[in-house]
């Protein structure tokens, strides 16, 4: 019996020795495997760090995502190594087979794959451009529509500059601008409103100027007054356009010196203004009065009375051509004279003119006296003839 026990003890010792050797080999194997896995995890971490260096130019969102995934990978790798060491120790204690460790590794790898998030795809530039071309016009249309529906679309501050003879209200009325008109219409149809303002016969030119946001300035230039048509005590302005104003002005508003016109025919006034515009300002300022003086030969002959009492007879249609010669003749005149430019150019004194007028008047009076004498003689002859006929009839 004792021998059998001894044999059994020997067998158990041998088994224990063999078991300890297997455990040693298993420990060495697991230790090597754990070291290899740690080295593999470190290599992966180095590769990821290198990849992060290459992709550092990418967007911050992507870098954050990659850094998060790298941290998760490193943490998971550390967890794996720790778990593997723990599993090796557990294997030492529990002596579980290698298949169980592989299953755990597969599960952790699957968890790791689920933890990794896919990187966001970058939107191509052409899609951004297409979206911009659609969104920008739509937004602009929305803003314009909202503006047109708001009260600001018709808000206008209109001012008038340059008026002397007219008023700001007259200019606004001539422009045709209404309170309900859109501000944008005034900007787009500036030429139309400027033309309407020029319908006022006082306005020579008009300009509509816009200032942000709602200010409009109408700058006008009026026609000059070149003369005044005089009828009795009333004075009517004649504009540089040839227009005769229908309303008289007060005597207080008259300038110190002005040109008086004693005819009001519209066509003759237009011709006179046109001819007057072609002569020099000095010669123009020397004229005091203009009146019609038609002759048998020249129907449009006019008489210009100068400020120095000289008189010039010149055809209206040739005034701009002939009147400049007066400046050359003037130094030769020693006393107030009449310069006749009807046919040629010659002059005589005002005294001679008065004598000629007196002689002409005497001739006319003599003719009238002769005419009266002839009429009286005819009447006397008729009366004597009547008396003779009456006497003859009474005798019978």
Curated annotation (Swiss-Prot):
Its main location: membrane. The chain crosses the membrane at residues 131-151. One of its GO terms (cellular component) is cell division site. The keyword Repeat does not apply. Keywords: Cell cycle, Cell division, Cell membrane, Membrane, Transmembrane, Transmembrane helix. Residues 153-223 form the POTRA domain. One of its GO terms (biological process) is FtsZ-dependent cytokinesis. It is found in: Cell membrane. It is a single-pass type II membrane protein. InterPro entries: DivIB, FtsQ_DivIB, POTRA, POTRA_FtsQ_type. Disulfide bonds: none annotated. Residues 1-23, 37-116, 361-396 are annotated as: Disordered. Belongs to the FtsQ/DivIB family. DivIB subfamily. Cell division protein that may be involved in stabilizing or promoting the assembly of the division complex. This is Cell division protein DivIB. It comes from Streptococcus pneumoniae (strain ATCC BAA-255 / R6).
């Amino acid at each position: 019996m004792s021998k059998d026990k001894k044999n059994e003890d020997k067998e158990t010792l041998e088994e224990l020795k063999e078991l300890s050797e297997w455990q040693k080999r298993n420990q060495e194997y697991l230790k090597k495997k754990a070291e290899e896995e740690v080295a593999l995890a470190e290599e992966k971490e180095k590769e990821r760090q290198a990849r992060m260096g290459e992709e550092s130019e990418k967007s911050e969102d992507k870098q954050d995502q990659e850094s998060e995934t790298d941290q998760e990978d490193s943490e998971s790798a550390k967890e794996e190594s720790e778990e593997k060491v723990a599993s090796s120790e557990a294997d030492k204690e529990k002596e579980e087979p290698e298949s169980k460790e592989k299953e755990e590794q597969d599960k952790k790898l699957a968890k790791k794959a689920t933890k990794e998030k896919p990187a966001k795809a970058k939107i191509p530039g052409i899609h951004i451009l297409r979206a911009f071309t659609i969104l920008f016009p739509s937004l602009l249309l929305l803003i314009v529509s909202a503006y047109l529906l708001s009260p600001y679309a018709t808000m206008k501050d209109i001012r008038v500059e340059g008026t002397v003879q007219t008023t700001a209200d007259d200019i606004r009325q001539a422009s045709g601008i209404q309170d309900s008109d859109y501000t944008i219409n005034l900007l787009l149809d500036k030429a139309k409103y400027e033309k309407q303002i020029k319908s006022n016969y006082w306005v020579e030119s008009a300009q509509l100027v816009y200032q942000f946001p709602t200010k409009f300035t109408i700058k006008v230039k009026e026609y000059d007054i070149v003369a005044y048509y005089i009828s009795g005590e009333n004075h009517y302005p004649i504009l540089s356009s040839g227009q005769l104003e229908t309303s008289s002005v007060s005597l207080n508003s008259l300038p110190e010196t002005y040109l008086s016109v004693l005819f009001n025919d519209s066509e003759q006034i237009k011709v006179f203004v046109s001819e007057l515009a072609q002569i020099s300002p000095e010669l123009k300022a020397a004229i005091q009065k203009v009146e019609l003086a038609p002759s048998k030969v020249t129907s449009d002959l006019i008489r210009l009375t100068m400020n120095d009492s000289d008189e010039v007879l010149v055809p209206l249609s040739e005034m701009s051509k002939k009147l400049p010669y007066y400046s050359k003749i003037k130094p030769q005149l020693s006393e107030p004279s009449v310069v006749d430019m009807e046919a040629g150019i010659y002059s005589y004194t005002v005294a001679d003119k008065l004598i000629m007028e007196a002689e002409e008047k005497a001739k006319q009076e003599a003719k009238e006296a002769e005419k009266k004498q002839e009429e009286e003689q005819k009447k006397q002859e008729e009366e004597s003839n009547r008396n003779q006929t009456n006497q003859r009839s009474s005798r019978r």
